[in-house]
């Protein structure tokens, strides 16, 4: 028989920072005719929430995050996610994918409209290099090697 654990006693022994406040955010981003955008909506030491927009045809290259889990939820458009072995998942509005740390992936905006995604990241340990290519070397997100292209906004058009 397992001993009973008194949750209240366990919680009393934990220190709580009473100064911590919630962070409110809104899912809004300008749509793009070219390139990509990436904005942090809220974050803590362990988690980040970002909204990403990729113009039609926008993409990145196969990479992994050695210390960070990622979850993507498609808000608008179509995303084609590909893995290290060539496996493919086509995701549309309100569908998502969880990519554990170390999982290689890439994605592209596959539909006729810009791709808008919510990205939630979680990591316990901070590493000097947070994104690596297939060769195991650093692959900065905003680099030509990662097919980065600055976003060109479509005047007056937003996802919200």
What are these regions (language model features)?
Residues 85-101:
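Short acidic-glycine-tyrosine-enriched beta hairpin
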Residues 62-63, 81-82, 99, 105-111, ...:
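Short beta-strand His + acidic residue motifs that chelate non-heme Fe in jelly-roll/DSBH
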Residues 71, 98, 113-131:
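A short hydrophobic beta-strand segment most commonly corresponding to one strand
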Residues 53-55, 64-81, 120-123:
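Short, conserved beta-strand element in jelly-roll/cupin
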Residues 93, 108-109, 129-130:
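Short glycine-/acidic-enriched loop or helix-start segments at secondary-structure transitions
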């Amino acid at each position: 028989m397992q001993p009973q654990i008194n949750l209240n006693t366990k919680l009393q022994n934990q220190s709580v920072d009473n100064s911590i406040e919630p962070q409110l955010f809104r899912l809004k981003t300008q749509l793009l005719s070219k390139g990509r955008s990436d904005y942090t909506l809220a974050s803590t030491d362990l988690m980040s929430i970002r909204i990403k927009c990729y113009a039609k045809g926008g993409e990145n290259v196969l990479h992994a995050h050695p210390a960070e889990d990622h979850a993507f939820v498609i808000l608008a458009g179509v995303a084609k996610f590909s893995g290290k072995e060539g496996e493919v998942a086509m995701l549309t509005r309100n569908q998502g994918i969880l990519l554990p740390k170390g999982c290689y992936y890439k994605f592209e905006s596959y539909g006729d409209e810009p791709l808008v995604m919510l990205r939630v990241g979680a990591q316990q340990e901070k590493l000097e290099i947070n994104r690596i290519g297939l060769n195991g070397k650093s692959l900065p997100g905003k680099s030509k090697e990662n097919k980065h292209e600055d976003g060109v906004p479509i005047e007056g058009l937003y996802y919200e």
